Curated annotation (Swiss-Prot):
GO BP terms in the entry: glycine decarboxylation via glycine cleavage system; nucleoside metabolic process
Protein name per its UniProtKB record: Probable glycine dehydrogenase (decarboxylating) subunit 1
Chain's gene name: gcvPA
InterPro entries attached to this UniProt entry: GcvPA, GDC-P_N, GDC_P, PyrdxlP-dep_Trfase, PyrdxlP-dep_Trfase_major, PyrdxlP-dep_Trfase_small
Organism from which the protein derives: Saccharolobus islandicus (strain M.16.27)
Superkingdom of origin: Archaea
The keyword Ligase belongs to this UniProt entry's keyword annotation: no
Enzyme Commission numbers on file: 1.4.4.2
Length: 455
């Protein structure tokens, strides 16, 4: 009888093989070509099951390889470090939320549905949008769903996307639209301001097949797009849908997308109470204005409020015929429950901050990021490639290769910015970067540059 060192209940394998009339596992997998089968033992762990003590010892050895940084990481690219109030962790750690998710008889879980309804309401107020779903996987998947949604609504095949939008989000979109016949056309940005090139936008939009126009606010370089309302007008003129990707914390300072009549809004709730953890988990935000042609095509779940037969208020999933409750090929998406727990974390975070707290936090981030940029550009031959105003993230150009600077920072247990080119890096500064941390970054870089220039 076949034995496997890792899987329990293996006596059942013989019973199952006998039931289906197959003599062995080799016979069962006979249709798989021999050249792609692995005919050797895999080098898994120690080659045998480990005891609890051995597993704990192995993990601790790996943990020792972690480097404790002297300051919060200065790398962002859309995923930035923020302080998370302990009450956020406490509430989502409660078993009612942490071990549960919306079941397929969702009305049984009234508490969870109400929490998600509160998330939708708070996010709708923040964005000034009418309808928000109960969450997506992340910004990239939300943007991809927005592109697919636009195609379903108007049947057009070309989507205009800025070159200065987050490249990681664009890669997700390209993956999701593969085989759909949808074309991504990139719009250039002004190399001096860092903002979208309006002339190129007019040129690229001069066709009848525009399904949607996307713009990110602030853009990938952290720069505020001052002409965003003009972009929305271009989309209206072309009878295309406007999609706005927005940094949620920046809304403490700038106008929300609903105020300039965006059709679809996407973003990421990572900024609102979620940790950094190998890039996840993230929490995609998806909102639309009040138009049933949009609402009916929204991906994801929507929690609504109603009354039962006794007149009591209750919460329910609404418009379920859009979702995976119907045939998969007819559903607008199959996103399922996804990031419900993290949506609740967002709701708790927003409730704690309130309007004034959001503004104060956004101002803190704005001033700290500008302080860091100012101190860095005081170093000889260090400059900013773009002249426009920015929030949280900013690009810095150096007189020496950034790889050398990055290596020096790592030696000092500092995580620098994201390399954009040989001499340019994108830095991130938030409320967790105090003056001491910023000054340490600046002095280390200055020492590195001065040492190279004098050698």
């Amino acid at each position: 009888m076949y034995k496997h060192p890792w899987l329990p209940n293996l006596d059942l394998i013989d019973e199952m093989l006998k039931e289906i009339g197959v003599n062995s596992l080799d016979e069962l997998f006979n249709d798989i070509p021999a050249e792609i089968k692995i005919n050797r033992l895999l080098n898994v762990a120690k080659g045998k099951p480990l005891s609890e003590y051995e597993i704990e010892k192995e993990i601790n050895e790996k943990v020792k390889k972690n480097v404790e940084l002297q300051a919060p990481p200065f790398i962002g690219a859309g995923i930035c470090p923020h302080y998370i109030p302990n009450v956020v962790k406490f509430i989502i750690g409660r078993s009612e939320f942490y071990t549960s998710y919306t079941p397929y008889q969702p009305e049984i879980s009234q508490g969870l549905l109400q929490a998600l309804f509160e998330y939708q309401s708070l996010m709708a107020e923040l964005l000034d949008m009418d309808v928000v779903n109960a969450s997506m996987y992340d910004w990239g998947s939300a943007l991809a769903e927005a592109v697919l949604m636009a195609n379903r609504i108007n049947g057009k095949k070309t989507v205009l996307v800025p070159e200065n939008a987050n490249p990681f989000h664009k890669e997700v979109v390209r993956t999701w639209i593969g085989g759909k016949g949808i074309k991504i056309e990139e719009v250039k940005y002004d190399k001096n301001s860092g903002e979208l090139d309006l002339e190129d936008l007019e040129k690229k939009s001069n066709i009848d097949d525009i399904s949607a126009i996307y713009i990110q606010q602030p853009n990938f370089f952290g720069i505020f797009e001052s002409n965003i309302e003009h972009v929305i007008d271009v989309a209206k003129h072309k009878r295309a849908l406007s999609i706005v990707g927005v940094n949620l914390l920046s809304l403490g300072l700038i106008k929300p997308p609903g105020s300039y009549e965006a059709d679809i809004v996407v973003g990421d709730g990572q900024e609102l109470g979620l940790p950094l953890n190998f890039g996840g988990p993230l929490m995609g935000v998806f909102a639309v204005r009040w138009d049933m042609s949009l609402v009916r095509q929204m991906p994801g779940r929507i929690v609504g409020i109603t009354k039962d037969t006794n007149g009591k208020m209750g919460f329910t999933l609404i418009l379920q015929t859009r979702e995976q409750f119907i045939k998969r090929e007819k559903a607008t998406s199959n996103i399922t429950t996804n990031e419900a727990l993290l949506a609740i974390a967002n709701a708790v975070y927003l409730s704690l901050l309130g309007k004034e707290g959001m503004r104060e936090l956004a101002e803190e981030i704005y001033f700290r990021s500008h302080y860091a940029a100012k101190k860095l550009t005081e170093i000889d031959n260090v400059s900013m490639p773009f002249r426009s105003d920015f929030f949280e993230e900013f690009a810095i150009r150096f007189p020496i290769e950034y790889d050398k600077i990055s290596n020096k920072l790592k030696e000092r247990k500092l995580q620098g910015g994201l390399k954009l080119s040989d001499y340019t890096s994108l830095f991130c500064v938030t409320e967790v970067h105090d003056k001491k941390s910023i000054d340490l970054l600046v002095s280390t870089i200055q020492e590195m540059i001065n040492g190279v220039e004098t050698s």
